[in-house]
Curated annotation (Swiss-Prot):
SUPFAM superfamilies: Phosphoglycerate mutase-like (SSF53254)
Protein name as annotated: 2,3-bisphosphoglycerate-dependent phosphoglycerate mutase
Organism: Mycolicibacterium paratuberculosis (strain ATCC BAA-968 / K-10)
Region (Disordered): 119-138
One GO-annotated biological process of the protein: glycolytic process
Gene responsible for this protein: gpmA
Source taxonomy: Bacteria, Bacillati, Actinomycetota, Actinomycetes, Mycobacteriales
Length: 249
């Protein structure tokens, strides 16, 4: 690589369950019309700012895959290589998957709700195998025994960072502009690593849907601008505030 490498992070556009304020995790829901528009706009922002990706990485969940496709189409980059991995999936929310966030907070209280939702190392109760929103019969996860039954953010760090180091970093070091289209918590895990955030500080990190976040990295893959730079800062601030408020109503 040269003196710097360019990495762009993009959380998927608004999903059907984002709009309903439900815990989603590994449940494979699609995008809303708003989410699709966010995805297209993110690709337009990339093109407008000349930030054209050479390689794309995403998860195995349709809300991220669809966002990636729409963004690449809008940026006229549908032809670049795309790699998908479960290691970029959203955090598994265990038995909370499919539950309304506000109702969950009312039932268990603010402290427990926030510990499950935002803490670094407190996983929700595990999901039961064979239940409606489990993934144990999903062929995508046959090689990993159906996937986890629950996760905290620390678990996402453990599964994602080796993939980032072993698979994505070589593209960055070769000079490619890399776009990662993933999820709120898988991206929080990566930002924690890039910015060397403490376990306590990452609790307050909120990543909005559908707005590209640019990181220019030095030779040690440390950010030249801590926290990166959103391509639409005003929309990003509003979106992050909306994420922070989920479950409060």
């Amino acid at each position: 690589m040269g003196e710097t490498a360019t990495l762009v992070l993009l959380r998927h556009g608004e999903s059907e369950w984002n709009s309903l304020n439900l815990f989603t995790g590994w449940v494979d829901v699609g995008l809303t019309d708003k989410g699709r528009a966010e995805a297209v706009r993110s690709g337009e922002l990339l093109a407008e700012q000349g930030l054209l990706p050479d390689a794309l990485y995403t998860s195995l969940l349709r809300r991220a895959i669809t966002t990636a496709h729409l963004a690449l189409d809008a940026a006229d980059r549908l032809w670049i290589p795309v790699r998908r991995s479960w290691r970029l999936n959203e955090r598994h929310y265990g038995a909370l998957q499919g539950l309304d966030k506000a109702e969950t907070k009312a039932r268990y209280g603010e402290e427990q709700f926030m510990a499950w939702r935002r803490s670094y190392d407190t996983p929700p109760p595990p999901i039961e195998r064979g239940s409606t929103y489990s993934q144990d019969a999903d062929p995508r996860y046959a090689d990993i025994g159906g996937g986890p039954l629950t996760e905290c953010l620390a678990d996402v760090v453990v599964r994602f960072l080796p993939y980032f180091t072993d698979v994505i970093v070589p593209d960055l070091r070769s000079g490619k502009t890399v776009l990662i289209v993933a999820h709120g918590n898988s991206l929080r895990a990566l930002v924690k690593h890039l910015d060397q955030m403490s376990d306590d500080d990452v609790v307050g990190l909120n990543i909005p849907t559908g707005i590209p976040l640019r990181y220019d990295l030095d030779a040690r893959l440390r950010p030249l601008v801590p926290g990166g730079t959103y391509l639409d800062p005003e929309a990003a601030a509003a979106g992050a505030a909306a994420v922070a408020s989920q479950g409060r109503g």
